[in-house]
Amino acid sequence: MTLDRSFVELNRAATDRMRALAARLTDEEMRHPVGEHWTVAIVFAHLAFLDRRALYVLDATEREGKVVNPDYNIFVNDLSLPFWAAIPPRQAARLAIETAEALDRRLEAYPPDLLELIHAEYKRYVFRAYHRTEHLNEAEAALNPVATS
């Protein structure tokens, strides 16, 4: 079966539309709401993220000779890296702290029977300290390598 190659022109047209929209919008317009939680800028970030996922699948499939879908850690960590890098440092810290506080409150008040189900599936959803501590240790070691040697 021959693949319908109309995707080439459709993709190019959508990319041209994206480029034109981005070129004409002000920063204020980029912050304009799109639905309840998104903005125009988030739409662009979402498109970039999922296009990076498609690029990963194409590269890995070509390398392996079979379709390769990224596992969760690659999908989230490797593909998200350029987006995280674009967040101003203080905003990244603020987001991490606010999210940790909200999650801590939610976990503390969560229905025990459901919490046990979640813990049985993946305990690190409940014991967030494991993941937080791992990365905080890495950050502190990078900032002060002599003290950790």
Explain the meaning of each model-derived region.
Residues 15-23, 51-55, 97-111, 136:
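Structural signal for well-ordered, non-membrane alpha-helices
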